[in-house]
Regions:
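Histidine- and acidic-residue-rich, metal-dependent catalytic cores
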Residues: 82-318
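Non-catalytic interface/linker regions that flank or bridge core catalytic/transmembrane domains
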Residues: 1-128, 132-133, 317
Length: 318
């Protein structure tokens, strides 16, 4: 069994499980040590400066399990979701080029699995509706963006990764907005909204010089809150000038926000969210992309209304 255990990360490990209660070195940075042997200790400690190394190690282990063909697709997707959450947590703490490149690997793994396993499409669609609303919203928006991009005909994996990165990074500018505004459990006042509306420009400034991100990804971060009739923000540009990636992220953002549990609102079922978007938020989204989003969840646009029952969801590999 021990031979099949994964290698340990290059960190020194200590234990307090000693008679005098003082830390005792279990393993030097590069010393071979059995992972199975560690299970003999109730708690293993590392130095604070090694925390990032251990986080990267855990992320890579989780990520690798997400592409193992011998695992059920549900388990692979759950592994990728966990890796994505770890990556995004680091990204919001430090939106550095290094952390953005790490996030790109996670998005690439989602796309890789989606393009090779028809079942992954259905699991992804369900996955995006069940994350609590914190950093996970960025992961959900990335997932929805990838799904919608594939649905409308994107087949090149690098394009889908760019779309997914746009979804993942769309709210990165909120690192520059006061936490009390971000976490307010109710409606924002005019001053707070004025601050919140700065996040697309802040986000664009953070990522504009990162060479591994494409121009269309960067513009999606800037433009995802533009609207029809030049009523959006930050630049109130004509709707025809808003990029396709930006429009994909806009609808993915809204849909994921509505279908995710928040401190002040219950998560809506996909059908309920689509009805609300159609009836109340149509000025914020592209009509053709909305039609495709409806089809993803097995419905017909003409069947969406505030009354009656939701249409039966079809299982499709598209």
């Amino acid at each position: 069994i021990d031979l099949k255990m994964p290698p340990l990360p290059a960190v020194a490990m200590f234990t307090y499980d000693t008679k005098d209660g003082k830390p005792e070195l279990l393993r030097e940075y590069d010393q071979p040590y059995s992972p199975l042997a560690l299970t003999a200790y109730p708690e293993v400690l590392i130095k604070l400066e090694d925390l990032k190394v251990l986080q990267h190690y855990a992320e890579q282990r989780i990520l690798s399990s997400g592409v193992q063909k011998n695992l059920p697709v549900e388990k692979r997707m759950e592994s990728l979701r966990r890796a994505a959450l770890l990556s995004v947590e680091e990204l919001f703490k430090d939106p550095s080029p290094e952390n953005i490149n790490r996030s790109r690997k996670v998005v690439g793994s989602f796309v890789y699995l989606l393009m090779r396993d028809p079942q992954a499409y259905l699991v992804l669609a369900r996955l995006s509706s069940h994350d609590p609303y914190t950093l996970q919203h960025s992961v959900g928006a990335a997932v929805n963006s990838i799904i919608l991009g594939k649905k409308i005909g994107f087949r090149n994996e690098s394009d889908l990764i760019d779309i997914g990165m746009a979804g993942l990074l769309h709210d990165i500018g909120k690192v520059g907005v006061a936490p009390e505004i971000i976490n307010k459990p109710g409606p924002l006042d005019d001053r707070e909204w004025s601050e919140m509306r700065k996040h697309p420009e802040i986000g664009y400034e953070i990522i504009k010089d990162i060479p591994t991100l494409t121009g269309v990804t960067k513009m999606a971060v800037l433009e995802h809150h533009e609207e029809k009739h030049m009523k959006g923000y930050p630049n109130k540009i004509p709707w025809d000038d808003v990029g396709l990636y930006s429009k994909i992220v806009a609808i993915a953002d809204i849909f994921n926000a509505l279908t995710t549990e928040r401190s002040y609102s219950k998560a809506k079922e996909p059908y309920e969210a689509l009805v609300l978007i159609k009836d109340k938020l149509s000025n914020k989204i592209d009509d053709e992309l909305f039609r495709e989003m409806v089809m993803i969840y097995g419905g017909q646009l003409e069947g969406l209304s505030g009354a009656g029952t939701a249409p039966q969801q079809k299982e499709t590999s598209e």
